[in-house]
Amino acid sequence: KNWRVMYLDIDVHHGDGVQWLFYDDPEVLTVSLHESGRYLYPGTGGVHEMGEAAGRGFSMNVPLEPYTQDGSFLEVFDRVVPYALEQFRPDALLVQCGADAHFSDPLADLLLTTRAYETVFRRLLALADEHTEGRLVLTFGGGYALDATVRIWAMLTLLALERDLPEALP
């Protein structure tokens, strides 16, 4: 069976490499929520980048303005990700869980808190159960504020393993 895969990139940088790899492939939907390329490397990820040939319409980019905070990010996530899953109907969801949109990251200007990451991860687990029968691959990536990155990745691991989160992650 040819699997349809949705690739979601929530790293602060545009998911350009994966997007270009599947730019003409209608079996892979790439969705990237990232800080706008007008301000941040690699300078790509505009809404006009939608795929080509048979893959036209299978690349979705949501460039966010610098200083985007939890509420706005979660609103965008809630409007885009469930809709993309409902419309595309993938067999599996692969998520690049960058930790560099955290407010303490020195290389970018999105202002997410650890609580926003927790909310996103919980929603991803529920969405995967609902739309892909739980077929979910989570990868780590991005994160240059080491304390925040370790906390975010530890939290993601605990949630994926269905473990309780401690009151404070060290």
Q: Where in the sequence are the language-model features?
A:
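A general "terminal functional-core" signal
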Residues: 1-170
